[in-house]
């Protein structure tokens, strides 16, 4: 499979699919899948192209999820090799999206192709959910496909997301969950005035300091065996006109929480509201829930993934829930068991992003073995 995976990876990288543009990547994949009798369904939403491709019927449904969009390349002059040339040097494939995640997407496609060729009459359903809206807004991609599938009661029981989960060597980490993410945009009201006449004004920076001190020091929980403790970080803060003689009339604070399963978004909102009342702050607050935490405990897919990684790489992966959010958060809402496995992530979103071509071949082998374990054939 390795040569096919490398060839498809290069073809995908050579398409400059800056999010949410797909630039023909999904069409290329669709043609391959159609050749091995996958049913194709195009699900465009807004400026995003999504592909739902299936082979077989019934249960269980094992889906592979990935994205064709990439982040911008930045200053191309900083790259050793052009970011969309997909050059291979010393067994390393260079290019934007090589590791995140056109390489693993190609590996998933070839693994599914190979499996259905070898097992044309398999039981259950194999699916690929591919979007071009993961790196940017993530509003019209996987989340919309999941909503569509749920509306028509079409389940996904197991899902492998091809995000680059490995850290130092292929297979050292498998993600079996992710923390939730919620952001607050908080506006604290004051009274603008002259700095020489503070008695005629109300400085929202000063009045908010005790609240911010408590907010940043508060311990939400102690985490658990699967998740680290919930953490809060102030991301942006702004007040004032830029002049040194004007007391600001408003303070804007944006903060984000990455939270574990010991709390939920309603607990967080309630506690923050309680703190704001405690200090008598005039305010308005807007919340944006990016994703709830999810965890695939020691289920069938987790065990199949661990076994496949051990067979292919000869190492036992660590199960981990750290890092940012992924599209797995949307698929988990269906009740699916979700894991993430893919190449080494050390160069993702960086200049000279690259992936080892041998690792891509091994990714394909892992995905193939997962198929053999989960789908009756």
Curated annotation (Swiss-Prot):
Its cofactor is Zn(2+); Co(2+). It catalyses: N-succinyl-(2S,6S)-2,6-diaminopimelate + H2O = (2S,6S)-2,6-diaminopimelate + succinate. Zn(2+) 2 binds at residues 100, 135, 349. Zn(2+) 1 binds at residues 67, 100, 163. GO terms for molecular function: acetylornithine deacetylase activity; cobalt ion binding; succinyl-diaminopimelate desuccinylase activity; zinc ion binding. InterPro entries: ArgE/DapE_CS (IPR001261), Bact_exopeptidase_dim_dom (IPR036264), DapE_proteobac (IPR005941), Peptidase_M20 (IPR002933), Peptidase_M20_dimer (IPR011650), Peptidase_M20A (IPR050072). Pathway: Amino-acid biosynthesis; L-lysine biosynthesis via DAP pathway; LL-2,6-diaminopimelate from (S)-tetrahydrodipicolinate (succinylase route): step 3/3. The keyword Phosphoprotein does not apply. This is Succinyl-diaminopimelate desuccinylase. Catalyzes the hydrolysis of N-succinyl-L,L-diaminopimelic acid (SDAP), forming succinate and LL-2,6-diaminopimelate (DAP), an intermediate involved in the bacterial biosynthesis of lysine and meso-diaminopimelic acid, an essential component of bacterial cell walls. Binds 2 Zn(2+) or Co(2+) ions per subunit. Belongs to the peptidase M20A family. DapE subfamily. Its EC number is 3.5.1.18. Keywords: Amino-acid biosynthesis, Cobalt, Diaminopimelate biosynthesis, Hydrolase, Lysine biosynthesis, Metal-binding, Zinc. The keyword Ribosomal protein does not apply. The active site is at residues 69, 134. GO terms for biological process: diaminopimelate biosynthetic process; L-arginine biosynthetic process; lysine biosynthetic process via diaminopimelate. Homodimer. It comes from the Bacteria.
């Amino acid at each position: 499979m390795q040569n096919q995976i490398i060839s498809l990876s290069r073809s995908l990288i050579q398409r400059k699919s800056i999010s949410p543009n797909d630039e023909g990547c999904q069409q290329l994949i669709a043609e391959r899948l159609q050749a091995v009798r996958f049913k194709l369904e195009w699900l465009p939403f807004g400026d995003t192209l999504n592909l739902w491709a299936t082979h077989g019927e019934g249960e269980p449904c094992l889906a592979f999820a990935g994205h064709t969009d990439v982040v911008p390349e930045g200053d191309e002059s900083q790259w050793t090799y052009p970011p969309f040339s997909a050059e291979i040097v010393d067994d390393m494939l260079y290019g934007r999206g090589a590791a995140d995640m056109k390489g693993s997407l190609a590996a998933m496609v070839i693994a599914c192709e190979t499996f259905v060729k070898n097992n044309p009459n398999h039981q259950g359903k194999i699916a690929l959910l591919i979007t071009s809206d993961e790196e940017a807004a993530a509003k019209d991609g996987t989340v919309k496909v999941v909503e569509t599938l749920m509306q028509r009661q079409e389940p996904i029981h197991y899902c492998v997301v091809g995000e680059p989960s490995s850290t130092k060597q292929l297979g050292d980490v498998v993600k079996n969950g992710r923390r939730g993410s919620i952001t607050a945009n908080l506006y604290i009201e004051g009274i603008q005035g002259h700095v020489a006449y503070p008695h005629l004004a109300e400085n929202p920076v000063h009045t908010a300091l005790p609240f911010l001190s408590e907010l940043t020091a508060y311990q939400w929980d102690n985490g658990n065996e699967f998740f680290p403790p919930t953490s809060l970080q102030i991301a942006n803060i702004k007040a004032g006109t830029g002049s040194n003689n004007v007391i600001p009339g408003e303070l804007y604070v944006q903060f984000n929480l990455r939270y574990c399963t010991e709390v939920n978004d309603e607990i967080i909102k309630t506690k923050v509201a309680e703190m704001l009342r405690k200090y008598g702050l005039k305010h308005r607050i807007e919340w944006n829930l990016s994703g709830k935490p999810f965890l695939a405990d020691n289920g069938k897919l987790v065990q199949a993934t661990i076994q496949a990684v051990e067979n292919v790489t000869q190492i036992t992966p660590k199960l981990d829930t750290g890092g940012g959010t992924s599209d797995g958060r949307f698929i988990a809402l269906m009740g699916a068991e979700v894991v993430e496995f893919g190449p080494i992530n050390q160069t993702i979103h960086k200049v000279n992003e690259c992936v080892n071509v041998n690792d891509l071949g091994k990714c394909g082998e892992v995905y193939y073995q997962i198929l053999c374990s989960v789908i009756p054939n």
